[in-house]
Amino acid sequence: MIFTARRRGSSPKFQVFNTALITALSDMTQAESLADREFWGRLTESAVGAHLINASAGGTCEVFYWWERNREVDFVLRKGKKLVAIEVKSGRTTTSLPGMESFSKSFKPGRMLIVGPGGISLERFLSTPVEYWINGAER
């Protein structure tokens, strides 16, 4: 799914509902998974996506991703008129987030969250109900 001001065709983003299948098929140990930055990044983003999709299945919100040209936002939550942009980072802290900046200029989300180093810890994000992040309980 894609969230834009105008409708246009795009390839859907593949999202698993449970990361167990990915890890089982990878045939990697936890240490190997952590050492492989690309794999760990996909796994981390998939875990966040599964958490958000499960919330959307319960009616909490709608979940999208946003991509325009070479800029993207990993996840966009919409509940009524509220928008929340979420960028997932699994490596080092990032100071430049051009996708978030571009999305913010175009859509003025109520919140922009970074999950991972320099933002909300992955453990905290996954153990907190999605409603908490939508309703702006923490700024």
Where are these regions (language model features)?
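Accessory nucleic acid-recognition modules appended to NTPase machines
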Residues: 1-73, 77-80
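Domain-level recognition of nuclease-like catalytic cores that cleave nucleotide substrates
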Residues: 119-139
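Active-site-adjacent loop/helix micro-motif of nuclease/hydrolase catalytic cores
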Residues: 92-100
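Arginine/glycine-rich "motif VI" loop of SF2 helicases in the C-terminal RecA-like domain
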Residues: 55-58, 102-110
